[in-house]
Amino acid sequence: MPLRLSLRIFDHEPARPSGAQVWRGGATDLATRTMIADPPRWLTIDEGSPVPAERPALREWMLEQINPGDLPSPENAGGVILVSMNVDPEREEEFNDWYNMEHIPHFNRLPGVIAARRFRATLGHPRYVALYHVETTNIYATPGWMAANETPWILRMRRFQRDRTYFMFRQRIA
C-alpha cells in the first residue's frame, strides 16, 4: 500500500501537529542554487491524519507516494528539498517512466541524499511532488546534484513540465 501524507507550505510558523515534521526554509533561487530566506516559509510533512490549520496554507497537498511506494519520511535529515510540477498530459507516461526508472534511482545513489521520493497529488496543485531528504541543502549546488539534472532524458522531459516550484527547508523545528 502506498504511503499517504499531507504536505503544506505556510508563510507563518504553523502549529506543530503531533508526529508531523515541521521545517523552516524558503523558495529556491535557481540562478545561485541557494535558499531565499526572506520571506521565510514553513513546511509540514504529516503521515497521520492532517490537523486543521489555524490559518490557510500557501500550498497544500494530499499525496500518494509513487516511488518508492511505502518509504516513510526519514527522521535524520539535515534538510528537505521540495520540487513540484505538472506535466503535459500527452507526455505523462514517459514522464513517469523517466522519474521512476532514471531520476529517483539516480538521486537515491547520490552521496548526501538520505531519501528521494515522488508523489502524486490526490488533492492540490501541481500534481507531482518530489521530496529529497538530504544531509544538507548545500547538496543542491554540488557537481553530483547538478549532473543528475543534466542527463539527456531529463533535458527532454523538462520541455514538458509546467508550473514548477522549488523550495529548500534547512531547519527542522519539530
Predicted regions and their residues:
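Macromolecular interaction modules
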Residues: 1-174
